[in-house]
């Protein structure tokens, strides 16, 4: 087997060897381009009773009300997010070419940025990186978003997004926003409350 591989490389031209090396490096770079832990942020200390009612909370060390990450997303919030933010969430692989094409057309037509075309996966990457919005950064977000789709399930990506999305002031994440604005847990949000929170990060 080893001799066959060696003979294969011997018969390749220099150009093909260089090209194969570049492709190999790109594939390896893509595999390892995403950090094992996306978010490196402090979280609030939260105390709840056995029924999940909030008894108290302590602000995170960076001055943000950021409750610990969620493992699931309430159904109403999930549906509102997909309706308002990313209708093709369950059908794309991190990047939605149709949304990007539509956003590009709208931006050119209006001669200013009116739409970003980002999927929820791309927005999750943006929240994790917290970099300036530039064309180069958008390309990086697209690459990392496709990589995240290979690593995590759609539900895990949604949970990452709702746990770290900004909801105004120093309120970060769905749980902190739900208690801050409505005085109850995210599981008890009404449709109207869910719709409001779904569009608030924008």
Question: Model-found features: residue ranges?
Answer:
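Juxtamembrane regions of bacterial inner-membrane/periplasmic proteins
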Residues: 1-202
């Amino acid at each position: 087997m080893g001799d066959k591989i060696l003979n294969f490389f011997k018969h390749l031209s220099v150009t093909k060897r260089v090209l194969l090396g570049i492709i190999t490096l790109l594939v390896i770079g893509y595999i390892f381009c995403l950090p094992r832990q996306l978010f490196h942020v402090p979280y609030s200390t939260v105390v709840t009773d056995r029924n999940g009612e909030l008894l108290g909370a302590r602000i995170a060390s960076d001055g943000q009300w950021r409750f610990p990450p969620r493992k699931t997303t309430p159904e109403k919030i999930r549906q509102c997010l997909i309706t308002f933010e990313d209708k093709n969430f369950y059908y794309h692989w991190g990047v939605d070419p149709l949304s990007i094409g539509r956003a590009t057309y709208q931006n050119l037509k209006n001669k200013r940025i009116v739409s970003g075309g980002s999927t929820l996966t791309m927005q999750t990457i943006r929240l994790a990186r917290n970099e300036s919005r530039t064309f180069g950064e958008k390309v990086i977000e697209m690459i990392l978003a496709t990589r995240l789709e290979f690593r995590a399930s759609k539900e895990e990506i949604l949970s990452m997004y709702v746990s770290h999305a900004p909801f105004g002031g120093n309120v970060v994440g769905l749980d902190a926003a739900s208690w801050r604005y409505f005085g109850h847990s995210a599981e008890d949000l009404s449709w109207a409350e869910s719709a409001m929170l779904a569009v608030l990060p924008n």
